[in-house]
Each structure stands twice: as C-alpha cells, then as structure tokens.
C-alpha cells in the first residue's frame, strides 16, 4: 500500500488518500472516536461504501487524528 495522507473535508470528516491521489476512504468523527470508512469505486465510477483496497480495515477506530499512526495501522497486513 502506498503512503496514506489525510485531507480535511470538514471538521468531522477527513479523506484518506494514497500518495497517487486515490481516495480509499474517510475518517469520520463519531461519538468522539475517529472511525475509518473504506471507499471503493466501480468500473464506471460508482461509489462502493465499505469497498476498495482497504475494505478489510472498514470501521477501524482511532482515538486521535495522527496521520503517521493511521497510515501505519491501515497499511498493515
């Protein structure tokens, strides 16, 4: 997996992008916890919630918005 970066969408949502700019998910602040929501795209651009290359990490939680920790945990195995 490429290096992952976070891009602020608003106060409650950050997009998770690869270093190639591919959108692979969002981090959403839910009840004080950051929850990863995987995103995939079908052949014609349709969004596949919970899909994509990080589908196995869907709903992973984080206590802080730490880009290094988030990237490391999402990229594991």
Residue ranges and their predicted role:
Residues 11-13, 31-35:
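A generic structural signal for beta-strand entry/edge sites
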């Amino acid at each position: 997996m490429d290096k992952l970066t976070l891009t602020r969408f608003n106060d409650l949502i950050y997009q998770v992008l690869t270093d190639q700019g591919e959108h692979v998910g969002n981090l959403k602040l839910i009840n004080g916890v950051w929850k990863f929501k995987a995103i995939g795209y079908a052949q014609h651009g349709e969004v596949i919630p919970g899909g994509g290359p990080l589908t196995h990490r869907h709903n992973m939680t984080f206590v802080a918005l730490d880009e290094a920790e988030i990237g490391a945990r999402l990229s594991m195995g």
